[in-house]
């Protein structure tokens, strides 16, 4: 499969990390503990990469960042839904690695080491203010949106670092977050979470 910038994907995303609420990394401040351990998940509700349909597939990215996110190199592992066929797997890898341009090309500039790209059984659920992800044998993450005035979502807009730069980010709290792979092991709860819809496209 050749690299193309003729693509667009839409869906929902969420993440959790070890930072206190709200994670200061999105404001280009240092992580709460000096390092950030984050797992980010996306569910593609509709998508197409140069003719390859991507509807209904999940993707996740685990990252270890030993300092301010824009000042140090990230160590990352990418997970692609095992239901993806060969063409879909290649398309999603090109998109989320930044090779196909768009938002992830900018994110890729911060990556210093890719420790793995693999397919895995993934279960992503979005219901109301709750989000959950299971990567079989590797990770489990569950967050719940926090209530603002009159129960409305608490949101962050126009933050300089964002997984989805053109959508308000809903602030959430983790109920559970475990990850174990590539020599990294995290077991957290009661920490930061974010979620929002997303639309990404090539240049």
What are these regions (language model features)?
Residues 13-20, 35-36, 50-56, 108-111, ...:
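Short linear motifs at secondary-structure transitions and domain/linker junctions
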């Amino acid at each position: 499969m050749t690299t193309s910038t003729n693509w667009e994907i839409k869906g929902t995303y969420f993440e959790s990390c070890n930072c206190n609420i709200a994670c200061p990394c999105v404001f280009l401040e240092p992580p709460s503990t000096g390092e950030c351990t984050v797992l980010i998940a996306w569910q593609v509700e509709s998508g197409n990469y140069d003719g390859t349909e991507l509807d209904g597939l999940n993707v996740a990215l685990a990252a270890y960042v030993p300092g301010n996110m824009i000042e140090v190199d990230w160590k990352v592992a990418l997970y692609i839904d095992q239901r993806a066929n060969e063409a879909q797997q290649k398309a999603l890898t090109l998109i989320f690695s930044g090779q196909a341009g768009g938002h992830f090309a900018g994110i890729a500039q911060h990556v210093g080491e890719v420790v793995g790209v693999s397919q895995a059984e993934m279960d992503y659920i979005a219901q109301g203010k709750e989000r959950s992800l299971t990567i079989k044998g590797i990770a489990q993450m569950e967050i719940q949106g926090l209530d603002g005035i009159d129960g409305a979502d608490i949101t962050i807009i126009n933050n300089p670092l964002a997984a989805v730069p053109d959508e308000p980010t809903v602030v959430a709290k983790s109920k559970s977050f475990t990850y174990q792979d590539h020599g990294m092991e995290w077991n957290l709860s009661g920490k930061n979470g974010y979620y929002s819809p997303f639309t990404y496209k090539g240049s």
